[in-house]
From Swiss-Prot:
Species name: Symbiobacterium thermophilum (strain DSM 24528 / JCM 14929 / IAM 14863 / T)
Gene Ontology cellular component terms for the protein in this record: cytosol
Record's compositionally biased regions (Low complexity): 388-400
HAMAP family in the record: Q_tRNA_Tgt
The protein, known as: Queuine tRNA-ribosyltransferase
Residues binding substrate, per UniProt: D93, S94, G95, G96, F97, D147, Q190, G217
């Protein structure tokens, strides 16, 4: 088996688990957050910087790499690891989320999805077999089955047809997988926000016996309470001895709540996306350092943080860089945000090892939500936007 997950300890107060993911490129402690390198690069950072942050596994995007530079070229270069000079593990998604986000540019059939490239408008067809062939060529350690990701809100009948198609596609992905001894193929469970469909999808996908399972179709606009409810329905139905991966989720509070409900792996572009607008994570919420209040603030982004940005620069300096459109400002905010999430997972793992995760979760969420509420109140009083990350970006090219 290309990847094996090892259970180390169960949390006595929740569904959380402490574990290890054994991969061809080393052991990864779980729960883990995976930085996203959509185009075979984590935006604004080089691989050594990502490694130094403590990341040991990153995600790359099949859809984007298929369109540019092409999976054949990546394979010719020796695979993703050599192409991007990354010594850790890599997970590739199947491209399903991106293709299904192209609502006006794609057509779904039982065979697969025809879509037009967001780059040049060229027409392409992605089937389960094609997606797996692309992922086999890219050479990641963990690859994801091709699934249909439904939007929110979603009609019940459509969601039901979708999970049944996803199950059929998952079986085709498994049959097409040409490198099972080198790459672990994870199945993906869906079901929108319908509890019975979440149960049905889990039953159908688990029956195919994958070495790990992605949980898809959440964090697509639904209220957080609904996401938590769906996790509580679906996660217990996934095999206890396999890793569980909540796809596209990466806000600090969602990581804590996901771990509480038994999730082992997470990914999201959020830390680098908001960094490009000067928004950073701190223990009491999100803070936008490009705001005028930080013009003469000579403290680090977060006192006590061990990241390169906080060890060397002040909020005032980083604000200056952002206002001057200097790339270093974006890099420093990205470094801090990624280190914040990697360290958060380190703290969660330490709390799980000590049997104190319930106390850690309570303290973290109380401080986080209190800080967020205070910033919203200050923003309302000032008639401003608070810590809003800036103008909305299109879903592509960077998506989740």
């Amino acid at each position: 088996m290309a990847v094996r997950w090892e259970l180390l300890r169960r949390d006595p107060a929740s569904a959380a688990r402490l574990g290890r993911l054994h991969t061809p490129r080393g052991v990864i402690e779980t729960p883990v957050f995976m930085p996203v390198g959509t185009q075979a690069t984590v935006k604004t950072l080089n691989p050594e910087e990502v490694w130094d942050l403590g990341a040991r596994i990153i995600l790359s995007n099949t859809y984007h790499l298929y369109l540019r530079p092409g999976h054949d070229l990546v394979q010719e270069a020796g695979g993703l690891h050599r192409f991007m000079n990354w010594k850790g593990a890599v997970l590739t998604d199947s491209g399903g989320f991106q293709v299904f986000s192209l609502a006006d540019l794609r057509k779904i059939t039982e065979e697969g999805v025809q879509f037009r490239s967001h780059i040049d408008g060229s027409t392409h067809f992605l089937s389960p077999e094609k997606a797996i062939a692309v992922e086999n060529a890219l050479g990641a350690d963990i690859i994801m089955a091709f699934d249909e990701c439904t939007p929110w809100p979603c009609d019940y009948d459509y969601a039901k047809r979708s999970i049944e198609r996803t199950a059929r596609w998952a079986a085709r992905c498994k049959a097409a997988h040409a490198r099972p001894d080198e790459q672990a193929l994870f199945g993906i469970v869906q079901g929108s926000t319908f509890a019975d469909l979440r149960r049905q999808s889990a039953e159908e996908i688990v029956a195919l016996d994958f070495p790990g399972y992605g949980i898809g179709g959440l964090s697509v606009g639904e209220p957080k309470e609904l996401m938590h409810e769906m996790l509580e329905v679906q996660v217990p139905l996934l095999p206890d001895d396999r890793p569980r991966y909540l796809m596209g989720v990466g806000s600090p509070e969602d990581l804590v709540e996901g771990v509480w409900r038994g999730v082992d792996m997470f990914d999201c572009v959020l830390p680098t996306r908001i960094a490009r607008h000067g928004t950073v994570f701190v223990p009491d919420g999100k803070m936008t350092v490009r705001n005028a209040e930080f013009a003469r603030d000579f403290l680090p982004i977060q006192e006590g943080c061990d990241c390169y940005a906080c060890r060397n620069f002040s909020r005032a300096y980083i604000r200056h860089l952002l206002k001057a459109d200097e790339m270093l400002g974006l890099r420093l905010c990205s470094i801090h945000n990624l280190r914040f999430l990697v360290r958060l997972m380190e703290e969660i793992r330490a709390a799980l090892a000590a049997g104190t995760f319930a106390e850690y979760r309570k303290a973290f969420l109380e401080r986080w939500h209190a800080g967020e509420a205070e910033r919203r109140e200050r923003a309302r009083a000032a008639g401003g936007a608070g810590h809003a990350p800036g103008p909305a970006e299109p879903l592509l090219p960077e998506n989740r």
